[in-house]
């Protein structure tokens, strides 16, 4: 195969080294504090445990 048919893709040096740039938006729609997130998750886990005790599987 002639070398003229082979196309070399130009890859940025940073991506060749395994470095990736992530662009994060600063305008988040919902902001939840980490403490509130932990409290909500504990309440949900407790709710699932209580529901599994009160409602026996068929």
Curated annotation (Swiss-Prot):
Self-association state and partner proteins as the record states: Component of the protein translocase complex. Heterotrimer consisting of alpha (SecY), beta (SecG) and gamma (SecE) subunits. Can form oligomers of the heterotrimer.
Localization annotation: Cell membrane
Keywords annotated in UniProt: Cell membrane, Membrane, Protein transport, Translocation, Transmembrane, Transmembrane helix, Transport
Intervals, Extracellular compartment: 54-58
Gene that specifies this protein: secG
Topological relation to the membrane, as annotated: Single-pass membrane protein
Location, primary (coarse class): membrane
GO BP, one annotated term: protein transport
Cross-referenced InterPro entries: Preprot_translocase_SecG (IPR023531), SecG/Sec61-beta/Sbh (IPR016482)
Protein name: Preprotein translocase subunit SecG
Keyword NAD belongs to the record: no
Entry's family note: Belongs to the SEC61-beta family.
General function of this protein: Involved in protein export. The function of the beta subunit is unknown, but it may be involved in stabilization of the trimeric complex.
Pfam families: Sec61_beta
Membrane-spanning parts: 34-53
Residue ranges annotated as Cytoplasmic topological domain: 1-33
GO cellular component: plasma membrane
Keyword Magnesium appears in the UniProt entry: no
HAMAP family: SecG (MF_00751)
């Amino acid at each position: 195969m002639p070398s003229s048919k082979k196309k070399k893709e130009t890859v940025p040096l940073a991506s060749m080294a395994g470095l990736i740039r992530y662009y994060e938006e600063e305008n988040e729609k919902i902001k939840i504090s980490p403490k509130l997130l932990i409290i909500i998750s504990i309440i949900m886990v407790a709710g699932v445990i209580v529901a599994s005790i009160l409602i026996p599987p068929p």
